[in-house]
Amino acid sequence: MEIRVFRQEDFEEVITLWERCDLLRPWNDPEMDIERKMNHDVSLFLVAEVNGDVVGTVMGGYDGHRGSAYYLGVHPEFRGRGIANALLNRLEKKLIARGCPKIQINVPEDNDMVLGMYERLGYEHADVLSLGKRLIEDEEY
């Protein structure tokens, strides 16, 4: 397995993977999310590749206060092999190298499948309520 930075030629394969991993929501246009990321620090957008195929992704960010991880997903046939752990570990190292003191991951409360993994990796529940506001309306995906 190789972990590397996203490249333009990964575009369609990544969107297909996100569909397979059930990461897409009607209010988020994945093509626009990728385009925006490519225009704003693509070096934190990582893919895991096995035999030339993209089997995992994580899209990271850093705002000077904390890091974040989005679109963490691994192809169902490749789960349980440590790929998500490796992606997060690489992202964390990149964030630490930038002086980032902490990372945040938003997970639906009922997603028990991944909550255990995050806890094993040292992530803790934060007693906060996450609020959001759409600033630019995308076309429904």
From Swiss-Prot:
Report the CDD domains cross-referenced here: NAT_SF
Q: What is this protein called?
A: Acetyltransferase YpeA
In terms of InterPro entries, this protein maps to: Acetyltransferase_YpeA, Acyl_CoA_acyltransferase, Bact_Acetyltransf, GNAT_dom
List the PANTHER family.
AMINOALKYLPHOSPHONATE N-ACETYLTRANSFERASE-RELATED-RELATED
**Family the entry assigns:** Belongs to the acetyltransferase family. YpeA subfamily.
The N-acetyltransferase domain covers: 1-141
One molecular function GO term is: acyltransferase activity, transferring groups other than amino-acyl groups
Record's superkingdom? Bacteria
- EC annotation from Swiss-Prot or TrEMBL: 2.3.1.-
The UniProt keywords, alphabetically, are: Acyltransferase, Transferase
Checking Pfam families in the record gives: Acetyltransf_1
